[in-house]
A protein has these predicted regions:
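Surface-exposed, interaction-prone regions used to assemble/regulate multi-protein complexes
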Residues: 1-115
Length: 115
């Protein structure tokens, strides 16, 4: 069975749809909830909803042009994403058609996994 970081690493972000972002202050740390519809892997024919919680978030940046996100929603408003690991922290960068998300985090979990 794959762990959550492996599941997220296999996601095909291109042409995915950003549905919701949320920040939560939980036990003196910030967590970030990302709800997307993405292709789970290369063999998946349709998008699946994923709810991913990033824990211990630091250095959060988010810029979004809402009109562009909405205009590109049916075709997919996510261009691509990459997760890097350095100095015991992860960093995710999500490029959108109409903006970007970028933040570092300590760990993540897939809350709702349809795989």
């Amino acid at each position: 069975m794959k762990n959550d970081i492996e599941i997220v690493d296999e996601i095909i972000w291109h042409d995915g749809v950003l549905l919701e972002t949320r920040t939560i202050c939980h036990h003196a740390e910030y967590n970030f909830i990302l709800i997307v519809e993405v292709y789970a892997d290369d063999s998946t024919s349709g998008r699946q909803q994923k709810i991913i919680e990033f824990m211990g978030v630091e250095h959060f940046s988010q810029i979004m042009d809402v009109t562009e996100l909405i205009d590109n929603q049916s075709a997919g408003n996510i261009k691509d994403a990459i997760i890097l690991y350095k100095k015991k922290k992860y960093k995710i960068m999500i490029n959108l058609f109409g903006g970007f998300l970028s933040f570092s985090f300590r760990k993540l979990r897939v809350i709702d996994n349809e795989c």
